[in-house]
Structures are given as C-alpha cells and as structure tokens.
Amino acid sequence: MPLTEDQQKRPPSAGISVDDVGRSTRSAAPQPPHASSQEWLPALLKRILPSTPSQVVQRVMLTVLVASVVILCIANPIFRQSDNLLNVLQQAAMVGIIAGGMQLMIISGGFDLSVGIVAAAAGCAAAYVSLQHGIAIGILVGLVAGLLAGFVNGILVAKIGINPFVATFGTQAVVTGLLYAATGATPIAPLPSGWTDLGLKNVAGISFASLTFVVVILILLFVLRCTLFGQHIYAVGSNKEGSRRAGIHVDRVLIAVYAIGGLCAAIAGILLVSISGIGSPATGTQWALLAIAAVIIGGTPLTGGVGGISSAVIGILSLTVLTNALNLYSVSAYWQPALTGTAVLLAVGFEAFRSARKR
C-alpha cells in the first residue's frame, strides 16, 4: 500500500512507541555504583584509624615523638645536627634490640628480667674467648651463651610452669653470681684492636650498632607479620589453652620466644663490647626495665596477645630522645628514671582509661 503524503513527511523517530522510549531512557540512565565501590572509604578508615586502646596509645606516642623531635630541632641547633641524630640512633641500638626481643615475649604473655645481665655475660664471654681464639669465635660463643640463657628461661616458664617474673628473676640472680665469680667483678681488657675496629665501622655515617639494630628489627617484624610462628605467638599470648586445643605447640613457641629474647640480649652485649672496647660485668643493669618500659610506652599492654615491633621502636626512640634532650639542656641524669616512670604510668593509665570507657 503506498504511503500518504503525511506519512512520507513524518520523521522516522515518530514511529517509536512510548514504551520503546521508556526502555531506551532507562537503559541509558547511569546505574548506581556497585556496593563494593561505596565501602572503600570505611574500609580505608578502619585500617588507618586506631580501633583498640593499645593502638590509640601507639598513635599518641608516635605523635608525641614526632612533635618532640620537631620542637627540639627548632629550639636547639645542636639537636638537629646530623652527628647528634645519628648518636641518638646509636644510643637506642642496644636497648632497642633487647626491646625487640622483649616485645615477642610480652606478646606471648611473659617477659624477661634477666636480659640485662645476660647481655653483660654474653659480652664478657665474647671478650674473654676473643683473647685466645679470635673475635669471630668470641662472638659466636657470646651468641650461644645468650641463646642458652633464653632457652633455660623458656624451659622454666613453659615446661616447669614457673611464673615468668620468678623464673627470670631467679635466672638473673644465678647469672649475676656466676658472672661476678668468673670475672672477679673486674672488666676484661685490653681486647684485640679488631673489637674497636668493628665498633667504628659505619655506612654513610650510620654506625655498625645502628645498622645491626635496624636489621634485627626488620627480621623480628618479618617473623611477627609474615610467618606462621608469628601468628602462633599472638595466639599463645591471647589464649594458651585455646591454642593447645587448636593444635599449637605452646611449649615450643614459648621456649623459642625466650631463646630469641636471650639471643637479642647477647647481640646487644656484644655490640657494647665493640663500642666500649672492654667486657664489663657491670653493664646492662637497667636494660631489662628500660626494654619493658619501651614496649609499654609504645602501646603494648602486658596482658599479651597484642602489639607489634613498632611499639618497641617508638618506645625506645622516645626514651632516647628524652635522654638526649636532658643532656643537651644539662638536666641532672637523676631525673631520667623519674621521667621514664612517669611516661610508663601515663601510657598504662591512658590505655586503662580507654578500655574502661569501651566497656
């Protein structure tokens, strides 16, 4: 049938029905974004913002540390000198390494009061053996001594079931007596010149002790975050009986953790020998308490099951910056223990307050 004149003049679109127009409009309209694309911001904030009291304490202490460093750099020209900043890092190295090992023990639900005297004993053992058999053999003997002391502590805590405070306090007393009897309470000196050569080594101005500190911290960080053993440490610290029922060898985990703590103490003691050039039985008397204080100030509670290596690093750097600032402003060293104790009380009190509010 031929088209009429009106039909020939009508545009092609006029033949489209209303339903067709509606369907095309709906198909062209932008669709709402998928639900997952709307959830990225809350997920990101959950990862960034602290969600537990210990994380809050850690972020607060990190903020205080950064602010203190910035203020001291502005207020004191000596503090911001590169030599002084590198000196701060070296001063933090020995106790920082011990604090790294202490962090693992505290996460597992314990701690070690003997690490200071173990560090001194390992240093003296390394120094004494090096006189007859060379520095390399001396260092090896010192490391084995620290590892053995930590292993004994682990056996006392895990296998015999002695409270960590009692076990490590007893170990501290035994090692102190043996060390002073063996050395006559006198330093071991003079030592081969290779010791001081080792202590003076540096890379781009960063001392050997500081580099060792960084390497040890990175290794411990990897162990906690990237290994099954690290997951077991958290599990044991959270619930020992539950971990046993889950098939975790709790005793092995605890023994390994205390052995690592003893090894870290030995590394610190040997580093001190390389810096000072002597093996002294009187060194490290306050290292255990400083290491525990550093972990607590960094935001890790003594309850176990939570925390990270960053807590130990933040804590020890905070204490070292405080000590350095006191020295720069000629404040008596007697104030340092009082200020350290105050920082510990504030950190623990703040965490307890946050926990009470959440309940």
Residues covered by each model-derived region:
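Membrane-interfacial amphipathic/re-entrant helices at transmembrane-helix boundaries
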Residues: L3-A99, Q132-I137, I248, A256
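Membrane-helix/interface signature in polytopic inner-membrane proteins
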Residues: I219-A259
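Transmembrane alpha-helical segments in multi-pass inner-membrane proteins
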Residues: A265, I275-G341
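Alpha-helical transmembrane segments within multi-pass membrane transporters and channels
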Residues: H133-Q172, I314-G315
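Transmembrane alpha-helices
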Residues: H249-V273, T285
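Transmembrane helix-bundle core of multi-pass membrane transporters
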Residues: I160, P164-T227, V253-A256, I275-G284
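Single transmembrane alpha-helix segments in multi-pass membrane proteins
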Residues: A67-Q132, I155-I162, I292-V295, G299-I309, ...
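Structural signal for alpha-helical transmembrane segments and their membrane-water exit/capping regions
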Residues: V64-Q81, S108, L179-P187, F222-L228
